[in-house]
UniProtKB/Swiss-Prot annotation:
This is L-cysteine:1D-myo-inositol 2-amino-2-deoxy-alpha-D-glucopyranoside ligase. Its EC number is 6.3.1.13. A motif ('ERGGDP' region) lies at residues 178-183. Belongs to the class-I aminoacyl-tRNA synthetase family. MshC subfamily. Binds 1 zinc ion per subunit. Catalyzes the ATP-dependent condensation of GlcN-Ins and L-cysteine to form L-Cys-GlcN-Ins. It comes from Salinispora tropica (strain ATCC BAA-916 / DSM 44818 / JCM 13857 / NBRC 105044 / CNB-440). GO terms for cellular component: cytosol.
């Protein structure tokens, strides 16, 4: 990330728990945990948009003089991964490694600053099992009496359950089964209780769990434990797509808060909107996913993809289409022509505007408009500052992650 003159200001971010914008004010080091992929398929544009959002946070923090400790998990053991491997007759470990490698290649192409720590769920299982046992001993978790060895979290153990998502119980019950929950599981104390530990099953991978018995962890506890181990009891940002607000982030925060006794787990719960295709929701079931690797193979400039995804505000659901990409390609071309001019209007005002827009809840559309204004002026011969094109180029690289 290139150094820029001066420093940016504090970053305001929308927090799902507050349902409003507040300053993210880390002192010295900003800590961020972002839920990564389940590596059974290639990186689609929804993944890319989410990762660009948190890349912008990291860039704005660093520009403000902060160090950043950024952790991202890889859910390298989960039912969808096992199901895809079985369908394709492939070893699940090989599938996970291949798709994780492709994801990282896609992120590099999009100029995402990598996390300081990429952590797989599998490597974290011993720590996760230990924390699940702690919850059992504290009375916040229980083992089913059906002989499966399955352990569930008791949501009644935390009176704060629901503070992040602000959903009614009826809404939770509707969403829970759509996002991996099992409200109809016999023997649970509450239909919304999430799985902490799945006891070993025939033909499924499992790991030693000490007093839990062999098995594998549930999804929510994986993220809670990885974040606690690497970032501590409280973090500045927990992030992901807005489909993770409930149950995933609600449950992982509940787990972490019960384990540490500190609230809130995250000072900001930040969620990126979903990406649709031509006005329809983009999903695996619809078969309309657009993959970053496919665009790259079609010789689409990754910087144009990045620009297209930043042309809408991160917090909003938005749509991808050919027109959006074409507009981004034209914008990128104009910026490159402007940056190649021998001189231009002073870029200091542009840098201040760029910083100001990004500090206001990552207003990337406003940031792009500021860059457009400078480029248009430069292209018609306004200004005679020979250093301006270089500063323009460096600012776009550092703050927007766009290399001209």
């Amino acid at each position: 990330m290139p150094r820029l003159p001066g420093r940016g200001g504090p970053l305001m971010l929308f927090d799902s728990a507050r349902r409003g914008t507040a300053a993210s004010a880390p002192t010295g080091t900003g800590t961020m945990y972002v839920c990564g992929i389940t590596p059974y398929d290639a990186t689609h544009l929804g993944h890319a948009a989410t990762m660009i959002t948190f890349d912008l946070i990291q860039r704005v923090w660093r520009d403000a003089g902060l160090d950043v400790t950024y952790v991202q998990n890889v859910t390298d053991i989960d039912d969808p991964l096992l199901e895809r491997a079985a369908r394709d007759g492939e070893d699940w470990k090989v599938l996970a490694m291949r798709e994780t490698a492709l994801f990282r290649e896609d992120m590099e192409a999009l100029r995402i600053i990598p996390p300081e720590h990429y952590v797989g769920a599998v490597e974290s299982i011993p720590d996760i099992a230990e924390r699940v046992l702690m919850l059992v001993k504290e009375g916040a978790a229980y083992r089913l009496e059906d002989g499966t060895g399955d352990v569930y979290f008791d949501i009644s153990a935390t009176p704060r359950f629901g503070y992040e998502s602000h959903l009614s119980r009826e809404q939770m019950l509707e969403i829970f089964p759509e996002r991996g929950g099992d409200p109809d599981r016999a023997g649970k104390r509450d239909p919304l209780d999430p799985l902490l530990w799945r006891g070993a099953r025939a033909d499924e991978p499992s790991w030693p769990g000490g007093d839990l018995g062999p098995g594998r962890p549930g999804w929510h506890i994986e993220c809670a434990v990885i974040a606690l181990n690497l970032l501590g009891a409280q973090i500045d940002v927990q992030g992901g797509g807005n489909d993770l607000i409930f149950p995933h982030h609600e449950c992982s925060a509940a787990h972490a808060e019960l384990l540490t006794g500190q609230t809130p787990f995250a000072r900001h719960y930040v969620h990126a909107g979903m990406i649709g295709l031509d006005g329809e929701k983009m999903s695996k079931s619809r078969g309309n996913l657009v993959f970053v690797s496919r665009l790259r193979a079609d010789q689409v400039d990754p910087m144009a993809v990045r620009l297209a995804l930043m042309s809408g505000h991160y917090h909003s659901d938005r749509s991808w289409n050919d027109e959006l990409l074409a507009t981004a390609q034209k914008r990128l071309g104009r910026w490159r022509k402007a940056a190649a001019m021998p001189c231009g209007p002073s870029a200091e005002a542009f840098l201040a505007a760029l910083r100001g827009r990004l500090a206001d809840d990552l207003d990337s559309p406003g940031a792009l408009a500021a860059a457009d204004s400078w480029a248009e002026a430069a292209l018609v011969g306004v200004g005679d500052d020979p250093a301006a094109p270089t500063l323009f180029t460096r600012a776009l690289d550092a703050l927007l992650g766009v290399r001209l």
